[in-house]
């Protein structure tokens, strides 16, 4: 509660979030019962969450985000290096960042983490595509996952959550395709045919259902290139099996490089996503933004 002594909470709500009204009701009850002052700001368009965070950061103790990874991406980018702690009320499809940080998916428990949690500094990635910067907490990528994001209808994501991606993902794997990737990691070039190229800040997907690669940490001052290069749909399924089993000893199909700066270009050009939001088309550059974000996470019991 000491983090809340500098002013009220600012609760930024994406009304398109899954169960937004129900989550807000739970959060209001928890904050009110604790005697904590809070303000609400409901977004109306892309970029609105970042505008709210930038405009009000100096007047509030904590910014709380109700939404998915895309809404969270906007807020942490706007607050980068401000030292302002960010709480999360998960309301997205995957909630990948919240899950990786141990945030409860149940609304009342997540709201209590806002009140009783501890601050945790974390790196961000700063992606530039088409001259525009986009911060991300989880990953930026091109390839099969981007096509899956683009082709899964919004109503399916709202109804089924992460399971809504499953059928689309299977279809993309069976409709197997690759592209030529030209990459640099800290100035060192790499060229490979690939089905997926990801710059990851967090390695765990859906509570370790999949692990993107070895030794990926969000607080080590580095990001991680994860290049997946199966030669067929059958090999692509094998790559997923390896990710589920955390077996990464297949250099002909899996390439991993840690670094601080990356460039990615593709032939043919590929759509780019950052934390679940489509942000442009290759080429793009990424830099690590060390310790840029501060999240409220659950206390660890002794």
PLM region spans:
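Short Gly/Thr/Asp-enriched flexible loops that form oxyanion-binding sites at enzyme active sites
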Residues: 71-82
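ATP/NTP phosphate-donor binding region
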Residues: 1-63, 73, 108-109, 302
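Short conserved active-site loop signatures built around small residues
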Residues: 49, 69, 197
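Glycine-rich phosphate/pyrophosphate-binding beta-alpha loops
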Residues: 141, 145, 198-214, 278
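Gly/Ser/Thr-rich active-site loops/lids in small-molecule metabolic enzymes
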Residues: 156-164, 205-235
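Catalytic core of DAGKc-family lipid kinases
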Residues: 12, 22, 34, 43, ...
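Glycine-rich beta-strand-to-loop/alpha-helix junction loops that act as flexible
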Residues: 15, 66-68, 91-92
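ATP/nucleoside-binding phosphotransfer catalytic cores, i.e., glycine-rich phosphate-binding loops
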Residues: 43, 185-186, 191, 217, ...
């Amino acid at each position: 509660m000491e983090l809340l002594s500098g002013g009220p909470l600012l609760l930024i709500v994406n009304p398109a979030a899954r169960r937004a009204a129900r989550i807000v009701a739970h959060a209001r009850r928890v904050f009110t019962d604790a005697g904590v002052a809070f303000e609400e700001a409901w977004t109306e368009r892309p970029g609105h969450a970042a505008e709210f965070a930038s405009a009000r950061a100096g007047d509030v103790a904590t910014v709380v985000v109700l939404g998915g990874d895309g809404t969270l991406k906007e807020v942490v980018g706007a607050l980068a290096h401000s030292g302002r702690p960010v709480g999360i009320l998960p309301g997205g499809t995957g909630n990948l960042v919240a899950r990786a940080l141990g945030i409860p998916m149940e609304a009342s428990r997540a709201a209590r983490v806002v009140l009783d949690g501890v601050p945790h500094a974390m790196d961000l990635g700063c992606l530039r595509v088409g001259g525009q910067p986009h911060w991300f907490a989880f990953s930026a990528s091109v390839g099969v996952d981007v096509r899956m994001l683009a082709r899964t209808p919004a109503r399916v994501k709202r109804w089924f959550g992460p399971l809504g991606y499953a059928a689309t993902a299977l279809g993309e794997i069976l409709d197997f395709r690759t592209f030529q990737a030209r990459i640099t990691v800290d100035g060192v070039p790499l060229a490979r045919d690939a089905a997926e190229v990801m710059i990851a800040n967090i390695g765990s997907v859906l509570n370790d259902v999949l692990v993107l690669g070895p030794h990926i940490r969000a607080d080590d001052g580095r990001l991680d290139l994860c290049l997946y290069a199966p030669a067929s749909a059958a090999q692509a399924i094998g790559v997923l099996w390896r990710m589920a089993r955390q077996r990464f000893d297949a250099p002909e199909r899996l390439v991993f490089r840690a670094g601080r700066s990356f460039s990615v270009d593709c032939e043919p050009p590929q759509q780019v996503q950052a934390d679940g939001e489509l942000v442009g088309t290759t080429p793009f550059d990424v830099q690590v933004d060390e310790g840029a974000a501060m999240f409220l996470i659950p206390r660890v019991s002794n």
